[in-house]
């Protein structure tokens, strides 16, 4: 059933209705993308989504191997090691998802330069929007990104101004957990 019908059905209980509508709205694939009119950020690149899935497989596979084979000998040190590694890998997976689902700093369609910088304003040749200084066009998401570092296929997103922290945390947690 479409989520607006469920919202009408649960109209008598507003708190359940709001939660149900939000969850079902978030599960709708049409709400995700890197276009100007999407509600939630997600780069819909098949290769990137596959690579991101492989990354999750290795993270959770590492946690599984640590728990199954690391705890064959029952000792306190093995238990502590397993808890630390699984915690770090879980935090790495959370950081990966935050990096993947966070807008990296894409320039909005209606962005205009400041009055002081209007004389030297640039326009992107590929997407036609205002291009601030230190912004670069990302070929995969087809958007200009402020302080773009690179496109990372392991998180299926461009690393930019708003998700740089999550990317560094992802690297640190996976490095320490491996």
PLM regions with names:
Residues 1-178:
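Intracellular leaflet-associated regions of eukaryotic membrane-associated proteins
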